Amino acid sequence: MAALAALAKKVWSARRLLVLLLVPLALLPILFALPPKEGRCLYVILLMAVYWCTEALPLSVTALLPIILFPFMGILPSSKVCPQYFLDTNFLFLSGLIMASAIEERNLHRRIALKVLMLVGVQPARLILGMMVTTSFLSMWLSNTASTAMMLPIASAILKSLFGQRDTRKDLPREGEDSTAAVRGNGLRTVPTEMQFLASSEGGHAEDVEAPLELPDDSKEEEHRRNIWKGFLISIPYSASIGGTATLTGTAPNLILLGQLKSFFPQCDVVNFGSWFIFAFPLMLLFLLVGWLWISFLYGGMSWRGWRKKNSKLQDVAEDKAKAVIQEEFQNLGPIKFAEQAVFILFCLFAILLFSRDPKFIPGWASLFAPGFVSDAVTGVAIVTILFFFPSQKPSLKWWFDFKAPNSETEPLLSWKKAQETVPWNIILLLGGGFAMAKGCEESGLSAWIGGQLHPLEHVPPLLAVLLITVVIAFFTEFASNTATIIIFLPVLAELAIRLHVHPLYLMIPGTVSCSYAFMLPVSTPPNSIAFSTGHLLVKDMVRTGLLMNLMGVLLLSLAMNTWAQAIFQLGTFPDWANTHAANVTALPPALTNNTVQTL
């Protein structure tokens, strides 16, 4: 038994290497089961899918495999693969990341967060709402990871003021206590950048240890306070995931949808920043509301019986302390600086120009230029370029006439060195890998072959198809990266829509949004992992809370797709640009036609 256990440990330690070597061999039969070109493309896609799900290679390195495998296997020439890594969609996302970097550099996000918390009050239910609203708003523009990493220390400091240091110590695991505590004292720690978080997490996964909470049997008040603490911590990563869906640049799957739409349906121009915001923002608000009600109900944020009535004076003192912590941290930021004002104005300009470029319901400012020349990427890059030369100190005409004034160069709002350090460049490669995969599916005929295999699903009602898609993808993304998940599923959804003869967006949008609805496990998303690493949450806490969150998300998404999304994207019709693609699918190569016809 000892030898067997030792062997198992060695196999586990070498699991990544074994996956790297054995999976390519295990997938070889696919090359002989399908038509040659389609089989080779499916081989590459399944290989990348396994590598992504197991993280045998870093996600961004796996995304580079099409550059190697597509040319070698005769699927696509290198001249067609490499440009997929720098489409205008990638530059739109890059501009959003750079804008987020400037906001973080000037601490504007912390000022916004503390100001909102000062406005909502410090009663538990209202504070949970304030945390969720603030986190979701920040996540619309910053990454989900950065928003969570910033808000958790603020939440912990407020909770320590409400309930005292004694309560938090009991909630921390005995082992590794120093490594899991999120906040020391009542001060707020330095927030790690997303680049630092991704770098630290790529080396391996933290052990998901469930530390038993030492709860006095005779203290219902203690239990209530601990539940409030859990409610605060669990609401932050959930609202970050929800908020990221509201804007096109909020999370990577949204932009992957845009890029793959342009690949599969080149004439499709209905999805842009403005139209997506009009669809997704109301959905985000609805989900936040029901999510807040559920979390507040489950963790006692709306219950005042017991400790509120018996200890009203004590509670008033605790709330005063919490207010003092928020106000002190806000005052520590000092008066608003010129650099903060400049970044805020550029951020507002960034959002307004993206929204108004082509909002669909009225002509946008892009109509002033030649059709098709100005995209969202042009707007984004134009605004963020200003960040690198606009001065961070208020310019003065007196300086030009004061020859004794120092002649040091003015620091810009954002330096390129800082952008290099804080922008997660690996996500750009991950996006490119998804676009290259979509291009390979289209050029090889694999998309058409998949469409032929989906023929039995032609009689599934579209409403049921949407529900099934959201449930399956929401479940799948609990165990795999949301970016990898949507890269794998979108080509299938596009072909399924053609077979069902429904608007492609009717299936592709819910598939994309449901990728962000990963609430049940710590490993589902980086925000979940950050919250779990504080040591205050158990896996069962996330499962019981996240299960209903997933269900509510699926139902609300189905509601949105069958109500206001119908008007925004004209989902009730089968568009001409999809008809063109359907005609291309029908005109299959001879080898592919034989295989497809046999399945019909």
UniProtKB/Swiss-Prot annotation:
Membrane-spanning residues: 17-37, 56-76, 83-103, 138-158, 230-250, 279-299, 337-357, 373-393, 462-482, 506-526, 547-567
Reactions catalysed according to its record: succinate(out) + 3 Na(+)(out) = succinate(in) + 3 Na(+)(in); 2-oxoglutarate(out) + 3 Na(+)(out) = 2-oxoglutarate(in) + 3 Na(+)(in); N-acetyl-L-aspartate(out) + 3 Na(+)(out) = N-acetyl-L-aspartate(in) + 3 Na(+)(in); glutarate(out) + 3 Na(+)(out) = glutarate(in) + 3 Na(+)(in)
CDD domains referenced in this protein's UniProt entry, alphabetically: SLC13_permease
GO molecular function: alpha-ketoglutarate transmembrane transporter activity; citrate transmembrane transporter activity; dicarboxylic acid transmembrane transporter activity; glutathione transmembrane transporter activity; high-affinity sodium:dicarboxylate symporter activity; L-aspartate transmembrane transporter activity; organic acid:sodium symporter activity; sodium:dicarboxylate symporter activity
UniProt key word Transmembrane: yes
pH dependence: Optimum pH is 7.5.
Regulation (activators, inhibitors): Li(+) decreases succinate transport in the presence of Na(+).
Residues annotated as glycosylated: N584, N594
GO cellular component: basolateral plasma membrane; membrane; plasma membrane
Membrane topology type: Multi-pass membrane protein
Family that this chain belongs to: Belongs to the SLC13A/DASS transporter (TC 2.A.47) family. NADC subfamily.
Extracellular face residues: 38-55, 104-137, 251-278, 358-372, 483-505, 568-600
Function: High-affinity sodium-dicarboxylate cotransporter that accepts a range of substrates with 4-6 carbon atoms, such as the citric acid cycle intermediates succinate and alpha-ketoglutarate (2-oxoglutarate), as well as other compounds including N-acetyl-L-aspartate. Transports the dicarboxylate into the cell with a probable stoichiometry of 3 Na(+) for 1 divalent dicarboxylate, rendering the process electrogenic. Can transport citrate in a Na(+)-dependent manner, recognizing the divalent form of citrate rather than the trivalent form which is normally found in blood.
Domain of life from the UniProt record: Eukaryota
InterPro entries: SLC13A/DASS (IPR001898)
UniProt name for this protein: Na(+)/dicarboxylate cotransporter 3
Cytoplasmic topological domain: 1-16, 77-82, 159-229, 300-336, 394-422, 444-461, 527-546
Reported tissue expression: Highly expressed in proximal parts of straight tubules in the kidney. Detected in placenta, in brain, and in liver. Strongly expressed within the meningeal layers of supporting tissue that surround the brain and relatively weakly expressed throughout the cerebral cortex, hippocampus, and cerebellum.
Subcellular location: Cell membrane
Residues in the bilayer without spanning it: 423-443
